[in-house]
């Protein structure tokens, strides 16, 4: 595309050079700039990428978007604007032909449940035989092809490229987890959402947002981003079991569907039957009552599957078809995932990393604990520590608790476990500053009939260590290796 055409609707501050040149790509990552690229520099929290402008010119970039003139050598056009990342969104959506307009785009926000709901929607679409994409904590996936990602919500250019890739590979729908960080930082500017889903709001990320009010406001941006053009068929799906839904309803101009278990809603789960193999409930809806079976465990997963079903139904799929598919869905990776049912213990991993999430996790597991409940949790470094003692208190609903760090980064692991221990309500706990050793200890003390829950990480494949270095780590693999060593079994014996 000609750069003149690309910048046509942007009121730039100053252009040094010519825009009468062809460009093929846009990037905010200096390492990926190449011949014909537009490079957008920005000043981040830790790095100002303006300092890489000479590098990108040497790599062949034809245009750089900056917030002040750069002293660099080479044949390059400089476009000076006050807000480079805002311009990056405009450029990316224009260059890639507004890809979110070309498929059904569903956004899921909330403190807990984002990954489960978004994954369930993706799996429902695949079960219906439709092309689908997922983007979130577990990576980026088009149909069954998956790649890992660094952030729940990628920066704006990378996000737009992923939506474009989904369109090019014939996805009919793309479901993405929408983080409060991504909303606050403007990473989703220009994304045309068709359905916005809210799961819940509990304390988290106050190290970034400062207050619960600011955190809640960030979540609400997804619903205001639906826009005001009422000629379009757009929907909000809100959890009536969370009081924050009332506020979100007030800022949403489109039709709203509410769901709930404990509070009256348009869509409700009734006559719930639970086991470690899944749940069965009557789904009471405005269009009839359906008998729903799912492989997911726990009351909170009933809320999650209702939200997913409503979202898919709202865009035209019959509820009968959705109910049929839901019965055979795969587990959501790292979300109340039972590892190897042949073991004499119930070994479970989960991503719960807030007090509310852990409460719901323990509520889900406790009815099926045959002997002891051994519960391992971690606290992340460089995060809001005000929530930590409450997490420790909730963990002590278990019979035995193991406190560990979780991505300690530059914080002292012993300090993190001590903060968790401040909330302990009994003395049946131990602290490990090495998470892997804590997991091995959990298995070592477990006896047949016990339930071991490894919480906080799910299948996250690394630990963030000092210097923000990512060291390979998998709770599930460490736990299984220790369990097979103690109890026997494993892949070689199956």
UniProtKB/Swiss-Prot annotation:
Motif L-lysine recognition motif: where in chain: 406-409
One term under GO cellular component: cytoplasm
PTM sites of type N6-carboxylysine: 219
Molecular function terms from GO: ATP binding; magnesium ion binding; UDP-N-acetylmuramoyl-L-alanyl-D-glutamate-L-lysine ligase activity
Keyword Cell division on entry: yes
One GO biological process term: cell wall organization
Group of enzyme by EC: ligase
Annotated UDP-N-acetyl-alpha-D-muramoyl-L-alanyl-D-glutamate binding sites: 30, 152-153, 179, 187
PTM summary: Carboxylation is probably crucial for Mg(2+) binding and, consequently, for the gamma-phosphate positioning of ATP.
Pathway where this protein functions: Cell wall biogenesis; peptidoglycan biosynthesis
Database matches in SUPFAM superfamilies: MurD-like peptide ligases, catalytic domain, MurD-like peptide ligases, peptide-binding domain, MurE/MurF N-terminal domain
Catalytic reaction annotation: UDP-N-acetyl-alpha-D-muramoyl-L-alanyl-D-glutamate + L-lysine + ATP = UDP-N-acetyl-alpha-D-muramoyl-L-alanyl-gamma-D-glutamyl-L-lysine + ADP + phosphate + H(+)
The protein's Enzyme Commission number: 6.3.2.7
UniProt subcellular location: Cytoplasm
Cited Gene3D superfamilies: Mur ligase, C-terminal domain, Mur-like, catalytic domain, MurE/MurF, N-terminal domain
Binding-site list for ATP: 110-116
Alphabetical UniProt keywords: ATP-binding, Cell cycle, Cell division, Cell shape, Cell wall biogenesis/degradation, Cytoplasm, Ligase, Nucleotide-binding, Peptidoglycan synthesis
Keyword ATP-binding attributed: yes
Family as reported in the entry's similarity comment: Belongs to the MurCDEF family. MurE subfamily.
Role summary: Catalyzes the addition of L-lysine to the nucleotide precursor UDP-N-acetylmuramoyl-L-alanyl-D-glutamate (UMAG) in the biosynthesis of bacterial cell-wall peptidoglycan.
Protein name: UDP-N-acetylmuramoyl-L-alanyl-D-glutamate--L-lysine ligase
Organism of derivation: Staphylococcus haemolyticus (strain JCSC1435)
């Amino acid at each position: 595309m000609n750069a003149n055409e690309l910048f046509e609707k942007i009121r730039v501050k100053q252009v040094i050079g010519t825009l009468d040149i062809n460009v093929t790509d846009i990037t905010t990552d200096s390492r990926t700039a190449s011949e014909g690229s537009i490079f957008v520099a920005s000043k981040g929290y830790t790095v100002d990428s303006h300092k890489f402008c000479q590098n990108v010119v040497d790599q062949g970039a034809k245009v750089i978007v900056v917030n002040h003139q750069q002293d660099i050598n080479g044949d390059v056009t400089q476009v000076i604007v006050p807000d480079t990342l805002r311009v990056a969104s405009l450029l990316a959506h224009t260059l890639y032909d507004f890809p979110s307009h070309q498929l059904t785009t569903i956004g899921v926000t909330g403190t807990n449940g984002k990954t489960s709901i978004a994954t369930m929607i993706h799996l429902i679409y695949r079960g219906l035989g439709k092309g689908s994409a997922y983007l979130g904590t577990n990576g980026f996936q088009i149909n069954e092809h998956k790649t890992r990602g660094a952030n729940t919500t990628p920066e704006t250019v990378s996000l737009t490229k992923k939506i474009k890739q989904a369109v090019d590979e014939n996805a009919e729908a793309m479901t993405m987890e929408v983080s409060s960080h991504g909303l606050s930082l403007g990473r989703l500017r220009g994304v045309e959402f068709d359905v916005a889903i809210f799961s819940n709001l509990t304390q988290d990320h106050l190290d970034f947002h400062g207050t619960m009010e600011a955190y809640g406001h960030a979540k609400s941006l997804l619903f205001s981003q639906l826009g005001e053009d009422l000629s379009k068929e757009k929907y909000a799906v809100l959890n009536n079991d969370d009081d924050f839904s009332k506020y979100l309803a007030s800022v949403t101009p489109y039709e709203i569907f509410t769901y709930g278990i404990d509070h009256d809603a348009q869509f409700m789960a009734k006559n719930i039957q639970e086991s470690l193999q899944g749940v069965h409930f009557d789904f009471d809806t405005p269009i009839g009552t359906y008998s729903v079976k799912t492989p997911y465990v726990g009351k909170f997963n009933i809320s999650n599957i209702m939200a997913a079903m409503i979202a898919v139904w709202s865009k035209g799929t019959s509820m009968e078809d959705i109910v049929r598919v839901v019965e055979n869905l795969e587990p959501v990776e790292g979300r109340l995932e039972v590892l190897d049912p042949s073991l004499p213990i119930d070994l479970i991993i989960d991503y719960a990393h807030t007090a509310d999430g852990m409460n719901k996790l323990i509520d889900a597991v406790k009815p099926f604990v045959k002997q002891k409940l051994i519960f391992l949790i971690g606290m992340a470094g460089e995060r809001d520590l005000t929530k930590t003692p409450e997490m420790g208190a909730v963990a002590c609903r278990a019979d035995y608790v193991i406190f560990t760090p979780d991505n300690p980064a530059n914080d002292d692991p012993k300090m993190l476990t001590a903060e968790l221990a401040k909330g302990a309500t009994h003395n049946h706990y131990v602290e490990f500053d090495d998470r892997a050793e804590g997991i091995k200890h959990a298995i070592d003390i477990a006896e047949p009939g016990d339930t071991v829950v490894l919480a906080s990480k799910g299948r996250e494949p690394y630990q963030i260590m000092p210097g923000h270095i990512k060291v390979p780590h998998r709770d599930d693999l460490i736990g299984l290796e220790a369990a097979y060593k103690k109890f026997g079994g494993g892949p070689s014996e199956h």
